[in-house]
Amino acid sequence: MNKLSTKLVVAIGIGAALYGILGLWGFSIAPNTFIKPALAILTVFGALFGPVAGLLIGLIGHTVTDTIAGWGIWWGWVISSGIIGFSMGLIQKRVGFSVKNGSFNKGDISYLAITGLVGIVIAIIFAGAFDIIVMGEPFDKIVIQVLGATISDVIVFLVLGLPLTIGLAKSNKKHTHLKIEK
């Protein structure tokens, strides 16, 4: 089994703390469903540190949010945050992609967009199914939650997460078009 480096463990801790605390902030769009800008943390940290970090940041961070909020831990939604973080981190495995070094191309951005969107849809459907099957929640309520959560997460991903990740990568680019005059 691969060991987690100290740097990765620290990144997971910081990412989970940020995701957990920022997850308390948002505004309601459906029963128990909020637009939460914290999802952008999963995008950025996943792209920086990979799928394992994204998974753990999502799992730990969402558990922190639910614990602090006091509404109990909703494990289906905790797992869904882990799935989303994992999917955001898949981009880090692409050869030539690095947010840290500012190396990316349009194909990388498309890949992140697709894996992010697919991950969000799979994760939210999982959470809804979990709530119906395991938690005994009413189907009608869950349909509204799943639709609301999917729409809000897609919006946050496309409006905040993706642009922040691209902006961070651009700011880390090693070369410029500036020339030294002699």
Curated annotation (Swiss-Prot):
Transmembrane segments: 9-29, 40-60, 71-91, 114-134, 142-162
Matching Pfam families: ECF-ribofla_trS
PANTHER family the record matches: UPF0397 PROTEIN BC_2624-RELATED (PTHR37815), UPF0397 PROTEIN SPR0429 (PTHR37815:SF3)
This protein's UniProt keywords: Cell membrane, Membrane, Transmembrane, Transmembrane helix
GO CC list: plasma membrane
Record NCBIfam families: PRK13661.1
Species name: Bacillus cereus (strain B4264)
Topology with respect to the bilayer: Multi-pass membrane protein
Main location: membrane
Subcellular location: Cell membrane
Protein name: UPF0397 protein BCB4264_A2665
Family membership noted in the UniProt record: Belongs to the UPF0397 family.
